[in-house]
Amino acid sequence: MTDNKDDKTLSVAGKKTLTLKPSGVTQGTVRQDMGRGRTKAVVVETKRTRGPLKHKDERPITPVAATPAARPAEQRPMPPQPSGRPAPQPQPHQPRQEQNRPRGGVVLNDLSAGEMEARRRALAEAQIRDAEEAKRRAEDEVRRRREEEERLAREKEEAARRAAEEAARPPVEAEKTEEKVEAASPAVGERRAETRPQPGRAAPAATPAAPDGAALRGRRGTESEEDERRRSGAGAPRGKVVRPEPAKPAPRAKGDEGRRQGKLTLTTAAVDEDGSQRGRSLSAMRRRQEKFKRSQMQETREKISREVVLPETITIQELSQRMSERAVDVIKFLMKEGQMMKPGDLIDADLAELIAGEFGHTVKRVSESDVEEGIFNISDVDDDMQSRPPIVTIMGHVDHGKTSLLDAIRHANVVAGEAGGITQHIGAYQVEQNGQKITFIDTPGHAAFTAMRARGAQATDIAVLVVAADDSVMPQTIESINHAKAAGVPIIVAINKIDKPSANPQKVRTELLQHEVFVESMGGEVLDVEVSAKNQTNLDKLLEAILLQSEILDLKANPNRTAEGTVVEAELDRGRGAVATVLVQKGTLTPGQIIVAGDQWGRVRALVNDKGEHVKAAGPSTPVEVLGLSGTPAAGDRFAVVESESRAREISEYRQRLAREKAVARQSGSRGSLEQMMTQLQTSGVKEFPLVIKGDVQGSIEAISGALDKLGTDEVRARIVHSGAGGITESDVSLAEASNAAIIGFNVRANKQARDASERAGIEIRYYNIIYDLVDDVKAAMSGLLSPERRETFLGNAEILEVFNITKVGKVAGCRVTEGKVERGVGVRLVRDNVVIHEGKLKTLKRFKDEVSEVQSGQECGMAFENYEDIRAGDTIECFRVEHVTRTL
């Protein structure tokens, strides 16, 4: 405490605080560097440690004050000695901050043995790190030299290759190139010589880069020593915050442009070091030569003709790309033809073909329908063909016994399952006779199912025409004959009901001659068999005739290929989904295959035959029910197996888009020409009877739609808002409510939600199972929409003899009835000079001042009109009665 003892006397006048300094503590002040030239005085207290006494052999180590980093920038270093590359020893340069820093008041203590040992270890570790750093720098130097040598070798090889190319050029071009290369090569060589370091040689003393390198090495050495001292903490008092000095670059001497020597600027880029204009580089010369060669080759290049694939519509830009021509050239050609178009404009295939032909290319036309190529009509090899069962269609007039005949053949009773005893579906069945199978298709006979008969004839090999012996040839019989002839299938005539007393088979044969059906007994080639379905008479003869005809036709198919056939019927079954009855005509259909039927597709989940049994495969001429389609296809659509779901989806989407476009075309087809506009004006006053029709199968819905279309007249017609196969749902009721339509269910029922919704909305749902009843009821309902017919009945004429003006009554005409009679309250017309002046009713009819109901011919009477008094003598009054009669379709 004696060192810091103050001799001043204590007083209360000063601002100092009375404190008691602890013993064993020394105080001092140091200047702390705050950065950017700012300093701060800091009070430092050092506490002495009372440790054990030192041994005699242990020498005290006086701590050395921290030496500031040396800066070798004030004087230029000496050039290196040729014997080695030692770093020059620069003069230590004291920073300004260290010079201005006060040294007074710093007290340093002795270091303990542990601290000295820690500092020795830190110094040894720093030396090891410095050795490793020096070794790494040496390895980097060796690697850089190796890379430089490799680069020089590559440049030599490139120069040799270039020289060989120059030697191979024609003499004239080589001379021109040499002149340009000579003009450019000196500058290039000088620049390369300046910028490329020479490995393995010591830099001369006059080179300015060497002193810089020496200074850099000296600076690195000084910085490493300073870092070592900073890490060891030598010379720094304990507790002092030491801020590391930022490494400052060595100052360069004036006129030292080493850093800016290789910098490329806009000014120096085009001028060499000697001030001359820079010439072209070798790369530029080489590019020019290649461009010249290309231009020479283009002059002699021949036109390449390509095959251009053209869709139905294409843009000009895409067409030019497919032809490998410029779009500008195509537009120029179109401008010459008088068409101003842009590259993004669409053109049709005809114009695109004309453009491609003008440019010398061939054309291959494609369309969207090409997605269906390769599905149907695939040719088979004759060696793979095998015999198949015949497909026989039973056709004829209604109630002539077609289904009963088929029942007798199948030993089943199908008629009992049909409502009203008439066939309303196409039934496909398979029977076996003498070990050979025959596939039968039963078609409806009445007029509503014309499309079904046509479909059955298209998918058949033989048509069996059933004619009742007691009823002879009827309208649907003639229609069936026409369908069979149109399909080009042979006909076998089955004269049914020969067991009836009124049967006359010979009359049937004679009437068939009128329709060009010549049976064998009449000298023709058509087979005829007299059968009785009721008594099962001559059924075996009918089957033998069918097998005989099939042998003549020699029916064959390839079962070892993808399946192909026709959709006979389709329905939406509750629990099974969409069910399609198909007839396989080629190949074999198995579960798991992907099929496309019309605009629907799906994977076959199950195959069910006509007996309700699940089968694993369906060969040619086999009728089966297919489960797994996405929707119900239309009856008569063809189906085929495809290889993948993507192909099936693509075909299905194309067909659905085609159907939508056709529907839109039908709706918008009424606009256009004047005749179409007149037709639209005529049909604009037609009353419509909206209907929502749900049926059990697609074919029945088609038959109902066709029958209702025939009911339409010029005044009223049926409009089917929606139709589909399946039960009546709540959405159908909502649609009917929105369109104010009636709901008709044919062999289907509505679910509970649909019934509740119909009761709330007041929509009537009618159920039918016989198509005749459905058509009759719709016909009666449509008749109610017809405006009643106005019928006018002539009663008589009266001639006005005199006109009287009576008070409170007005003008009264004194008349004589010249024809018929005149009644009060009927319609009258006032005719003057054969022109109708007024039409109204009689207000009063009097004879001799008495009101009478009628006046006969030859009698006189007085008549007055309601709200009309312009009557004159000589006018004629015509009396008539109007009646409104209800019309029917």
From Swiss-Prot:
Coiled coil: none
Stretches for region G1: 396-403
Compositional bias ranges of the Pro residues kind: 77-93
Region (G4): 496-499
Biased composition (Basic and acidic residues): 116-182, 220-231
Cross-referenced InterPro entries: EF-G-like_DII, EFTu-like_2, IF2_assoc_dom_bac, IF2_II, IF2_N, P-loop_NTPase, Small_GTP-bd, T_Tr_GTP-bd_dom
Function, in words: One of the essential components for the initiation of protein synthesis. Protects formylmethionyl-tRNA from spontaneous hydrolysis and promotes its binding to the 30S ribosomal subunits. Also involved in the hydrolysis of GTP during the formation of the 70S ribosomal complex.
Recorded family membership: Belongs to the TRAFAC class translation factor GTPase superfamily. Classic translation factor GTPase family. IF-2 subfamily.
Name listed for the protein in its UniProt record: Translation initiation factor IF-2
The species this protein was found in: Rhizobium meliloti (strain 1021) (Ensifer meliloti)
Record lineage: Bacteria, Pseudomonadati, Pseudomonadota, Alphaproteobacteria, Hyphomicrobiales
